[in-house]
């Protein structure tokens, strides 16, 4: 948990703590009903006069904001990888269908040039997202500055996931729209990529500020 011990210091007063679920005053209430990632529970935590002992302080006092940003920067690589995997799953599911099952006018729809162009474009974008993820992860592991690369990977991989999962439903037609298969689930799960670990607009802001810093003389 993060709490501000000295609001007069703004973000410099934020401190991290460990709070045990058995701590008096802490309760878990409403479980949210979500569009996607339903296997991961999102619940409301209530803190009613909760007292936290000093030994539960995590790290140094006043360093909570720094820790949180560090977690977010690293987490963005993971979210980018998650969204890339989602794109691959949505693509594979739809590609198998259009090249093996679905026919129109006597031929598989995957054989039509227009469909092949869409599939080729989607695959190119998925591969580009994957390389952005690999590059950000490589820099992180090497101890290099990776913040901009992580933001770019998350931004682009999230965009690709939403785009490809949506197209995949269209490629599959009615079979993509019903819940008998995973196509609609890929689409529902893709939206969170543009939200958690920093929204897409936050990624753009981060990238823009770092670019300005690089090019300002």
Residue spans for each PLM region:
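Alpha-helical interface subdomain recognition
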Residues: 44-46, 63, 69-217
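Active-site PLP-lysine loop of aminotransferase-like
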Residues: 5, 36-37, 76, 154
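A short core secondary-structure module
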Residues: 1-28
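Glycine-anchored helix-breaking recognition loops at helix->coil/strand junctions
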Residues: 31-35, 58, 99-104
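Exposed loop/turn and edge beta-strand positions of beta-sandwich/beta-sheet ligand-binding modules
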Residues: 13, 41, 151
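Solvent-exposed alpha-helices and their adjacent loops that cap or buttress functional pockets
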Residues: 7-11, 35-39, 59, 70
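Long, acidic (Asp/Glu-rich), low-complexity accessory segments flanking structured domains
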Residues: 48-66
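Flexible, small-/acidic-enriched active-site or ligand-binding loops
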Residues: 22-53
